[in-house]
């Protein structure tokens, strides 16, 4: 199923959803958005935050072309060979059977992000030889390995060539339930969710923001309600996903760095690009949860551990840890993504992503064997 730019204007429905979301806890609080500066329209930027109660054990990886992959779904796993190289942020890659790709960008400028969605329900059909399985832990990587644009990825995903599978979160009585966002160098965007066992794709350049619960169609309803109020009058300010969605949506549409930096419009493309990067970082920080903040009765409201920003046109991947004084970045143009005989490269970020890097960090990656995706 695919939904394209459907506007929902029912205020009554929106008010009901506001009441519903105020009464529910968020399982995992992350935010993702695509910033499209109307004064710099050919320069899209994607930013995301990772909020989690414990150390996500995140590292950065360089994956080359022609890397053989298995989808982590047991006997009938989807198998493929990567067409494009990528730089990604992992989670739990030090734990056998737990690793995943949570965020990243490939050499063509396609970005992928997975965020928590408690309402996710994946197909109950078991993988077979004719229709193999793909673990949610490998979902983002599959897209980065195989596609150059959002449109190309969406057209392939619509064919449903695989069955998406999940497993219980280690030490918890719940399944890993995620949804996927995609964005590219044209500013195109897509949100892919599994609701009631069926794939739902929201594909439009207008779908710039994604958080967690509720489902994306309901987030659009909430946003329509707040649009009527107007962000200059009042914006919801809690750490809940619905509130972060509204705040991020307001700012990505209303910020104007040209007003803040004198003469930026006349200083040329480089200065405009710098201003847009600063804007993206400021918005994602606004949607972040302060480090060390938690609620005793709501353990799933968690601190922001790290943030990433993707410069799709310059092919730069920025990383900011909550416990490091520096932002650093990886310039994909400086990386040789040619096949490496099955090997990859890893940038060890240390416990709680506390290892300090500065500036362009591609030279600090060390050869490493790719991790295996968490699976059945």
UniProtKB/Swiss-Prot annotation:
<comment type="subunit">
    <text>Homotetramer. Dimer of dimers.</text>
</comment>
<keyword id="KW-0378">Hydrolase</keyword>
<dbReference type="InterPro" id="IPR029055">
    <property type="entry name" value="Ntn_hydrolases_N"/>
</dbReference>
<feature type="active site" description="Nucleophile">
    <location>
        <position position="30"/>
    </location>
</feature>
<keyword id="KW-0732">Signal</keyword>
<dbReference type="GO" id="GO:0016787">
    <property type="term" value="F:hydrolase activity"/>
</dbReference>
<keyword id="KW-0574">Periplasm</keyword>
<comment type="function">
    <text>Catalyzes the hydrolysis of penicillin V to 6-aminopenicillanate (6-APA). Shows high specificity towards penicillin V. Can use other beta-lactam substrates, including penicillin G, ampicillin, cephalexin, cloxacillin and dicloxacillin, but at a rate less than 10% of that of penicillin V. Does not show any activity with glyco- or tauro-conjugated bile salts.</text>
</comment>
<dbReference type="GO" id="GO:0046677">
    <property type="term" value="P:response to antibiotic"/>
</dbReference>
<protein>
    <recommendedName>
        <fullName>Penicillin V acylase</fullName>
        <ecNumber>3.5.1.11</ecNumber>
    </recommendedName>
</protein>
<dbReference type="Pfam" id="PF02275">
    <property type="entry name" value="CBAH"/>
</dbReference>
<dbReference type="InterPro" id="IPR029132">
    <property type="entry name" value="CBAH/NAAA_C"/>
</dbReference>
<dbReference type="GO" id="GO:0042597">
    <property type="term" value="C:periplasmic space"/>
</dbReference>
<comment type="similarity">
    <text>Belongs to the peptidase C59 family.</text>
</comment>
<feature type="signal peptide">
    <location>
        <begin position="1"/>
        <end position="29"/>
    </location>
</feature>
<keyword id="KW-0046">Antibiotic resistance</keyword>
<keyword id="KW-0021">Allosteric enzyme</keyword>
<dbReference type="InterPro" id="IPR052193">
    <property type="entry name" value="Peptidase_C59"/>
</dbReference>
């Amino acid at each position: 199923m695919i939904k394209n730019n459907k506007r929902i204007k029912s205020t009554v429905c929106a008010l009901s959803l506001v009441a519903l979301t105020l009464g529910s806890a968020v399982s995992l609080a992350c935010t993702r958005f695509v910033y499209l500066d109307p004064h710099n329209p050919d320069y899209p930027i994607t930013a995301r935050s990772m909020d989690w109660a414990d150390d996500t054990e995140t590292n950065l990886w360089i994956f080359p072309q022609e890397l053989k992959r298995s989808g982590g779904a047991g006997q009938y796993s989807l198998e493929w060979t990567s067409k494009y190289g990528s730089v990604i942020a992992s989670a739990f890659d030090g734990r056998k059977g737990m690793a995943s790709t949570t965020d990243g960008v490939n050499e063509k400028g396609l970005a992928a992000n997975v965020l928590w969605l408690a309402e996710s329900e994946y197909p109950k059909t078991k993988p077979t030889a004719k229709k193999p399985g793909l673990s949610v832990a490998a979902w983002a990587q599959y897209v980065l390995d195989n596609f150059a644009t959002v449109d190309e990825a969406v057209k392939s995903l619509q064919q449903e060539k695989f069955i998406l599978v999940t497993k219980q979160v280690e030490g918890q009585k719940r399944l890993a339930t995620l949804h996927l966002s995609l964005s590219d160098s044209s500013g195109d965007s897509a949100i892919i969710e599994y609701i009631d066992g069926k794939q739902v794709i929201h594909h439009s350049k207008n779908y710039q923001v994604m958080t967690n619960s509720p489902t994306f169609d309901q987030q659009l309803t909430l946003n329509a309600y707040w649009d009527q109020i107007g962000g200059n009058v009042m914006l919801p300010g809690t750490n809940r996903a619905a509130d972060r969605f509204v705040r991020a949506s307001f700012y990505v549409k209303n910020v104007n760095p040209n007003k803040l930096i004198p003469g930026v419009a006349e200083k040329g493309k480089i200065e405009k690009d710098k201003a847009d990067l600063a804007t993206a970082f400021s918005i994602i920080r606004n949607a972040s949860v302060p480090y060390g903040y938690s609620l005793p009765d709501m353990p799933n409201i968690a601190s922001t551990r790290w943030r990433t920003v993707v410069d799709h046109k310059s092919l730069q991947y920025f990383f900011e840890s909550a416990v490091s004084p520096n932002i650093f970045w990886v310039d994909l143009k400086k990386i040789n993504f040619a096949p490496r005989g099955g090997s990859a490269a890893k940038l060890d970020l240390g416990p709680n992503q506390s290892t300090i890097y500065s500036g362009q960090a591609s030279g600090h990656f060390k050869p490493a064997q790719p991790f295996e995706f968490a699976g059945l």
